[in-house]
Amino acid sequence: MMRRALPSGPQRRLVLAALAGALLALLVAAPFAFADPLTPESGGGSQNAENIDRLYKITLYIGIAIFLIVEGTLLWALVRYRARRGAPEAAQIRGNTPLELGWTIGAALILVVLTVVTFIYLPDIENPPPSGPNGLRADQAQFASIDQPDPPRSGGPILRIEVNGQQFLWRYDYAGGDQLFTYHEMVVPTDTTVVLEVTATDVIHSWWIPKLGGKVDGVPGHVNETWFKVRAGREGIYTGQCAELCGAGHADMRARVRAVTPDEFESWAEETRANIQASGEELSEERKRRDASEGEEG
């Protein structure tokens, strides 16, 4: 019986260098799995973002444990049963019923655990909660709507905003029929549930601010809904990025939400509405002057 020769010195060093390089690559890549730009930060601005973050980390930690067990066992077997000079060729084993049952049942149990955990978190990720006591008041509800996927059990008004993606910016239209809208920056009150209707005008875009929840595609002719609720006391700027390649200006299509107190939101809404009305009146006057000028020339 022929025996397999051990790798020569240079070949052995090459194999060890390759293994060391692979291990180094894994160590270098590991921190990126926790990088803030890729996943919602722990303790984010909204409850659904925090639940997404928890579910992601549970799945990640289970995956890391499986990886370490499998790769550790593989490395142990490579060292423990490595070929030795003068040793006979190892016996060829075809199948091991206990081992095969073990890793099949083990994998099934892991899937069951992940499924159960997912369904525990999923309702709190999908269904918007009621607005809090410090949110938008009933007398400020001209922007609000209770027509939403899962109406709140109690609490204040729900703020509904249409998010319309366009190359290469976002337009935000507030419910209420008073033509309140903004570009680039969405302004919302804290402690108020905000339901978003995400769509697009031209191509597919994807609205994503990690601290406020998962990404949602904006598809022309179709509306996808999501929600977030910035807790009271967490006023500030929340930023994100269009997460769907949508053209040459995709990198500049950023999303921005400014969370303010309900009173500050009311003041901002009144000022913005007045500015829109003034701009409309100015445009109307300009059109009248242009039409009059064209009439005189005719």
Language-model-detected regions and their locations in the chain:
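Non-transmembrane, membrane-proximal soluble domains of secreted or membrane proteins
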Residues: 33-58, 78-298
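N-terminal secretory/membrane targeting signals
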Residues: 1-35
